[in-house]
C-alpha cells in the first residue's frame, strides 16, 4: 500500500501547514486549502472554479460530498494516529441545502463519536456569506497495521515518521 506523506504538526497540534505542503491527488485537483487540521476539528476551503460546476452552473454535488469526506477523513485519521491506527470511510451521507455558483466554500468537520473500531464525523459546508450549503456525516472503520485493504497490507506510521 502506498504510504501517506510524513506529517509534522505545529506545537498546537495543527497539521494544516503539513497537509497543504503535501497536497496531491483529489485535494490538489480541487484546490483544497487546509486552515486547521487537528484530531478535534478540521477546516478547509476552496475557491469555486469552472471545474467545480455542473451543467446548470452550480457547484456539483460531488464537490460538496468530496469536501465533506476530505475534512472528516483528515480528522478521523489524525484521531486514529494516537492508537497507531489508520481509517477508511464506510459511508458518506451528504445533504445539499443551498445551491452556490461562485466564491469560497469552507468546510468544518468535528467528531460525533470516536470509538476503538469506528468513528463518526459531521461536517458542514458554508459559502462566503456563511450560509450552509451542504452537510454530511461520514463513518469510518479503524485499521490496524497488518490489516488487508483492497489486496494490500495496511501500514500505519506516526505523525512524524517518514
Residue ranges, per PLM feature:
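Terminal targeting signals and extreme-terminal segments of soluble enzymes
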Residues: 1-162
Amino acid at each position: 500500500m502506498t504510504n501517506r506523506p510524513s506529517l509534522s504538526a505545529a506545537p498546537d497540534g495543527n497539521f494544516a501547514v503539513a497537509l497543504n505542503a503535501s497536497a496531491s491527488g483529489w485535494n490538489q485537483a480541487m484546490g483544497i486549502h487546509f486552515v486547521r487540521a487537528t484530531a478535534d476539528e478540521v477546516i478547509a476551503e476552496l475557491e469555486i472554479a469552472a471545474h467545480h460546476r455542473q451543467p446548470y452552473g452550480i457547484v456539483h454535488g460531488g464537490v460538496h460530498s468530496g469536501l465533506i469526506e476530505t475534512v472528516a477523513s483528515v480528522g478521523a485519521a489524525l484521531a486514529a494516529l494516537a492508537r497507531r491506527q489508520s481509517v477508511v470511510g464506510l459511508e458518506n451521507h451528504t445533504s445539499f441545502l443551498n445551491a452556490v455558483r461562485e466564491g469560497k466554500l469552507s468546510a468544518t468537520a468535528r467528531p460525533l463519536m470516536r470509538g476503538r473500531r469506528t468513528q463518526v464525523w459531521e461536517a458542514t459546508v458554508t459559502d462566503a456569506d456563511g450560509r450552509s450549503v451542504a452537510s454530511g456525516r461520514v463513518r469510518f472503520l479503524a485499521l490496524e497495521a497488518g490489516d488487508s485493504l483492497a489486496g494490500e497490507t495496511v501500514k500505519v506510521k506516526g505523525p512524524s515518521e517518514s
